[in-house]
Regions:
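Alpha-helical interaction scaffolds
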Residues: 1-166
């Protein structure tokens, strides 16, 4: 949560840097290209049963990964709001997440897919107030009957509904 708190400050700082050093904007586009790797289906940490020997380490890894993804989403939304990310880049991010979300919510319920869906939902929520086109995609997901969305748990569904209010 601390990292997301600083996202707007970091975006403001980057905007100042980009004014002085125009190449910084191009560097930023390279930096945000980690999006595909960060939100890849294979990049999901699952928490084992609390009786598992590696439970403590897994909880730490899971928390760090979740925070990294949440912070990235808030940061790109702040960068976009300041004109540092072009509409085309943000649209690609939103479309990629929305398409993945539409597909994954329909998958058979397994821990990895449900966790991935939660991360995608959190991305949509983080950018919803800055990127209005997100809401069309959210409505599309929410319009799918519950019986057809085994990987969309109630917590994620409520998060999407909350995003529509932003």
């Amino acid at each position: 949560c601390t990292q997301t708190f600083y996202a707007s400050l970091m975006a403001d700082t980057y905007a100042e840097i980009a004014q002085t050093y125009p190449d910084a904007k191009a560097d930023l586009l390279t930096q945000v290209s980690m999006f595909d790797t960060l939100y890849a289906t294979s990049n999901v940490t699952i928490v084992p049963a609390h009786t598992d020997e590696g439970y403590g380490d897994a909880i730490i890894a899971w928390t760090k990964q979740k925070e990294k993804k949440r912070t990235f989403a808030v940061y790109v939304a702040e960068l976009y709001a300041r004109g540092l990310l072009p509409q085309s880049v943000m649209s690609v991010f939103v479309k990629t997440v929305a398409d993945d979300l539409l597909e994954c919510v329909r998958h058979t319920k397994v821990a990895q897919t449900e966790e991935h869906v939660d991360c995608l939902v959190r991305f949509m929520f983080a950018v919803a107030s800055r990127v209005p086109e997100v809401k069309v995609h959210i409505r599309a997901v929410l319009s799918i009957p519950k019986a057809e969305t085994p990987c969309l748990n109630m917590k994620s569904k409520f998060k999407l509904e909350d995003a529509l209010k932003l």
